[in-house]
């Protein structure tokens, strides 16, 4: 048994030795995905999809609470429609997959497989918005999109991925700005409260903003290896798309006005954040609030009379307060321990003959490995408390890591030294895109966001030494 368990654990490369390989090992061994037949595609397996489904359900509930309605738009976009907004199409052109034939017949116009759906929503709005009474339009779509990526990795960057994309139209710039901010706050709430991942909130630089946007807001998370991951974005389009697609309405005075639009999206990329923020060398660690199974009961010496019966009684008891499962298979307990540690199930519940005799169970935390003996009469209450403790600890641990990995640089020598240590660097910037490009060229770090809270760590730009305009968080990123 010991040898089998050891071999099971050895399938994971230590993150300290090779973080990229550790990530790949966890994704595979935790049974989250398999590789698709086309390069860059993935099969999200039942356990991986169950986690995504819990994330999706929470987010969908939040959307509906803020008045949004779900819709489903086509997968295909005519080339002529995609090209209507110049900046937008240029931003996506290298990644677009094209349909050129229908059966044996060559199409007269190429059809894009949607990389995103702005132009489809704009075309719809141009035909369905006529009066101020038609506003606002608050739509969200769950679906998949295709972006023909050159370098791929499961969840983080794939040629096809699942996501939601919200598209809204408003009468005024102020309403659109309010919507852009509200949806970023919605993402931040989801990621921090449910995924236990702390995020930075801020605005993208003009160089990094979404193609065709007036401005882009972002949440940025820090991974265990010190790299950043953009985890959700919200875009204010102003009237740019409305002018390109002639989306106008008559206001209360009978005057024609262009609508103000937003879009916002969060994808299965957030699964990558979940893995790389909380995972360890034993595998995945899933926060209780989104865990498909919050507690797994493992009977010990289950072949002995009465053990399985008591374990199933316990399951029925705990199922009233949490998502609970039981492994009644004939696999050895050690194998089961490793299996559910690998899958990151928040709490393991052990029950054997001695525990039954003492009317107790053993609760084992996935995040710390700590064990505690709990009377059966108190186990429901204690499990609920313990799940809350695990959730809070995962968030605090990730926040402490981010704080430890956030430093300040006042000149390029200091910047170059600190970027090698990983993490976020707070540095002043003059606002000139040439400095932003120089920093990327010299260090491979990119601007992650201009934070909401104004802060000054120096008077001059970290790159050129001229008068600084604002503070920027920089990092190497996925």
Swiss-Prot record:
Its main location: cytoplasm. Belongs to the class-II aminoacyl-tRNA synthetase family. ProS type 3 subfamily. HAMAP family: Pro_tRNA_synth_type3. One of its GO terms (molecular function) is transferase activity. This is Proline--tRNA ligase. Keywords: Aminoacyl-tRNA synthetase, ATP-binding, Cytoplasm, Ligase, Nucleotide-binding, Protein biosynthesis. One of its GO terms (biological process) is prolyl-tRNA aminoacylation. SUPFAM superfamilies: C-terminal domain of ProRS (SSF64586), Class II aaRS ABD-related (SSF52954), Class II aaRS and biotin synthetases (SSF55681). The gene is proS. Homodimer. Catalyzes the attachment of proline to tRNA(Pro) in a two-step reaction: proline is first activated by ATP to form Pro-AMP and then transferred to the acceptor end of tRNA(Pro). It catalyses: tRNA(Pro) + L-proline + ATP = L-prolyl-tRNA(Pro) + AMP + diphosphate. PANTHER family: BIFUNCTIONAL GLUTAMATE_PROLINE--TRNA LIGASE (PTHR43382:SF2), PROLYL-TRNA SYNTHETASE (PTHR43382).
């Amino acid at each position: 048994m010991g040898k089998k368990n050891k071999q099971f654990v050895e399938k994971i490369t230590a993150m300290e030795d090779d973080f990229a390989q550790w990530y790949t090992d966890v994704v595979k061994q935790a049974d989250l995905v398999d590789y698709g037949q086309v390069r860059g595609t993935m099969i999200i397996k039942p356990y991986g999809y169950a986690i995504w489904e819990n994330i999706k359900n929470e987010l969908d509930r939040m959307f509906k609470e803020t008045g949004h309605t779900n819709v489903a738009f086509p997968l295909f976009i005519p080339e002529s429609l995609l090209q209507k907004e110049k900046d937008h199409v240029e931003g996506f052109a290298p990644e677009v997959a094209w349909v050129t034939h229908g059966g044996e017949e060559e199409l007269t116009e190429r059809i894009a497989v949607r990389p995103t759906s702005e132009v489809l929503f704009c075309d719809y709005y141009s035909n369905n918005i006529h009066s101020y009474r038609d506003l606002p339009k608050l739509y969200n779509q769950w679906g998949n999109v295709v972006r023909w990526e050159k370098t791929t990795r499961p969840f983080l960057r794939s040629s096809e991925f699942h996501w939601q994309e919200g598209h809204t139209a408003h009468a005024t710039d102020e309403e659109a700005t309010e919507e852009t901010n509200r949806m970023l706050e919605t993402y931040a709430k989801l990621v921090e409260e449910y995924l236990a991942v702390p995020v930075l909130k801020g605005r993208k630089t003009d160089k990094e903003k979404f193609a065709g946007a007036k401005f882009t807001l972002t949440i940025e998370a820090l991974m265990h290896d010190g790299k950043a991951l953009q985890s959700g974005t919200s875009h204010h389009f102003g009237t740019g798309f409305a002018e390109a697609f002639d989306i106008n309405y008559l206001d209360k005075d009978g005057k024609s006005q262009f609508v103000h639009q937003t879009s916002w999206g969060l994808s299965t990329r957030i699964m990558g954040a979940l893995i790389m923020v909380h995972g360890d060398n034993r595998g995945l660690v899933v926060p209780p609030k989104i865990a498909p199974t919050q507690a797994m009961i493992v009977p010990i010496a289950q072949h002995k009379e009465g053990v399985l019966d008591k374990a199933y009684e316990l399951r029925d008891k705990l199922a009233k307060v949490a998502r609970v499962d039981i492994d009644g298979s004939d696999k050895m307990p050690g194998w089961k321990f490793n299996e559910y540690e690998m899958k990151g199930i928040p709490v393991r519940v052990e029950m054997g003959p001695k525990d039954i005799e003492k009317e107790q169970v053993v609760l084992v935390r996935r995040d710390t490995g700590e064990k505690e003996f709990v009377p059966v009469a108190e186990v429901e209450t204690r499990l609920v408390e313990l799940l809350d403790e695990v959730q809070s600890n995962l968030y605090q641990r990730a926040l402490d890591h981010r704080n430890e990995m956030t430093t300040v640089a006042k000149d390029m020598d200091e910047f170059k030294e600190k970027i090698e240590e990983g993490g976020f660097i707070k540095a002043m910037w003059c606002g000139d895109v040439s400095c932003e490009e120089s920093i990327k060229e010299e260090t491979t770090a990119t601007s992650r966001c201009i934070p909401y809270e104004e802060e000054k760590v120096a008077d001059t730009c970290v790159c050129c030494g001229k008068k600084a305009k604002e503070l920027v968080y920089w990092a190497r990123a996925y």
